[in-house]
Amino acid sequence: MYKISFAGLLRGNDKDVEALAEAATTQGFLELELDCMEAKALQKDVKFLESFAESILDSPEDVKAAYHFHKTGRFRTTGFKPLGSEEGAKAGNPDGFEFFFLPQKEILLSEFREQLNCPPLAMSNIDTLTDCFKHYERTAQMLLQRLTEGLKLGNELLNAHNTSLPCVTNMGLIRYPPQPKESGNFGHIAHTDVGSLTILAATQRGLQTLDNITQKWIWVDPSDECLFVQLGDSLKFLSRGKILPSLHRVLPSDVAPEATKYTIAYFLRPNEEAEITSDDGKVWLYKDYHCRKFDAFARPLGYRPDGEESLISLRDYTGVE
């Protein structure tokens, strides 16, 4: 697995930029070493967000229902998702996670702050959450800049992620409760992320990504010294196929199935009005393509309308028992 220095990318070191470009075109994922002062701010953010995730996901059920992510905010970027409401990583089983989403647009762009619709617990922590978003945004923009340089692209990536314009970027605070073999809930279906890149931290093992060279699933071990970065569909589209999105899934931990797992996921996504061209040649506004893929996740088990097979990638149950 590629392990790339945050400090090296920040300085624009040729070796690290080349490694990032190689990871993007061969695997679609990498580990980002937190080896400088700027990166240490992210480590601090992760610790706060893990604690906040536990608190917000312990909210009463009536609060979770009132802020369901299908009816809160815009483009599925805000609110709670209940456990077991989508298809899981095992055929016929519902998923094994719940989440709370926070939107970047309403938090970082002052002209939209009054539109933020979140539970009181989130609002009482809004200053710290704002700082977290700023640190993640700077990191994501740095990665886009280095990808542009390493792959000798034009300004496609940077123009589609203009920080002064409304975007669909958000933060996911995700909880996987214990899932022993007798549990009916089972992980998260194999898929590629609809957005541009995802910056992940986790408290327990569970994430698997497909090694594109060996075509085998590999476990991703969480580490306090690294963040895991996955590249998504939108970077593939914006780079005209140069960047490879990471196919991944979440299974119950093979070493701690009785543990509760928390994942902090920063989902960098394009601006709402950015144009992307999907694999079939159709041009979309990102906000519309985003909602189409999120709706595909929520389909009933075994149901997939024509034209959606490429959206959930794919029902690969290899190695799932």
From Swiss-Prot:
Residue numbers binding 2-oxoglutarate: 261
Sequence positions that bind Fe cation: 191, 193, 248
Entry-linked Gene3D superfamilies: B-lactam Antibiotic, Isopenicillin N Synthase, Chain (2.60.120.330)
Enzyme Commission number(s) from the entry: 1.14.-.-
Organism phylogeny: Eukaryota, Fungi, Dikarya, Ascomycota, Pezizomycotina
Top EC category: oxidoreductase
PROSITE patterns, A to Z: FE2OG_OXY
InterPro entries per the UniProt record, alphabetical: IPNS-like_FE2OG_OXY, IPNS-like_sf, Iron_ascorbate_oxido_reductase, Oxoglu/Fe-dep_dioxygenase_dom
Molecular function via GO: dioxygenase activity; metal ion binding
Keywords for this protein: Dioxygenase, Iron, Metal-binding, Oxidoreductase
Applied biotechnology uses: Pneumocandin B0 is the starting molecule for the first semisynthetic echinocandin antifungal drug, caspofungin acetate. Pneumocandin B0 is a minor fermentation product, and its industrial production was achieved by a combination of extensive mutation and medium optimization. Inactivation of three of gloP/GLP450-1, gloO/GLP450-2, and gloM/GLOXY1 generates 13 different pneumocandin analogs that lack one, two, three, or four hydroxyl groups on 4R,5R-dihydroxy-ornithine and 3S,4S-dihydroxy-homotyrosine of the parent hexapeptide.
Name listed for the protein in its UniProt record: 2-oxoglutarate-dependent dioxygenase gloM
Encoding gene (name): gloM
Cofactor(s) listed in the protein's UniProt record: Fe(2+)
